[in-house]
Amino acid sequence: MQETLRGQKTTNNFKIQKVNWQNIKVSADNTHFLFEGKQIFEKDFIGVLKFHTPGIAPVFDNTGAYHINIKGEAIYSERYTRTFGYYCNRAAVVLNEKWFHINELGKQVYHNSFLWAGNYQENLCTVRDANNQYLHIDLDGHKIYSETFTYAGDFKDGIACVKTASGFYKHIDTQGNYLNNIEFLDLGIFHKNFATAKDKVGWHHIDKHGSGLYNERYAAIEPFYNGFALVTQFDNQKVIIDERGQKIIMV
């Protein structure tokens, strides 16, 4: 059920009868919130970020950083150095240079802290530990595999990109197993079964076996969008290709 706000007055006496949090926008200067172009909550903040499910937004004022509901009320009494949006009912926060996640009551959900923490995706989150190594944790802050990496990105559809100690990029699953045995100089996430990858010749698209979809290499590429992708040749000419690598049009 969407949380709604009834009878809330704005600074210009505009009354909101019913508000879906998804329709609350951030002002251009990132200091307050707007509904239908008009300010709500009768308050300016030092900084705000947009609302996320289930209708909670990170804000910062002279008391510190915290989260508010769609009535503009703080949802807990704690204050942090910095707060971010809720994902999977967890929000990344910073307190005295320590990064960790809190629940919707503002309480830390695990005992350890990190040098950096991302946002939970698919109930898993990438973090950077005290040795500046990246890994993924579950909702309770537990490592989901034993290895650490030079870098680790978010999971999408159960697959994440990591940079190994060898300096190459690979894909892993949620158990930390490599998706295939092929290493790349750079790597993107899978989108509709294909990922962007860079080898010593250039960029191309690969499948989950790490095999290239075509022989051509490019200076830059984008993920496939409904069967087609924008790529940049080494002469800087941009081209639309299909999933077989066939050049369709110059753009």
Annotated model-derived regions:
Residues 2-251:
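Residue-level detector of conserved, function-critical positions
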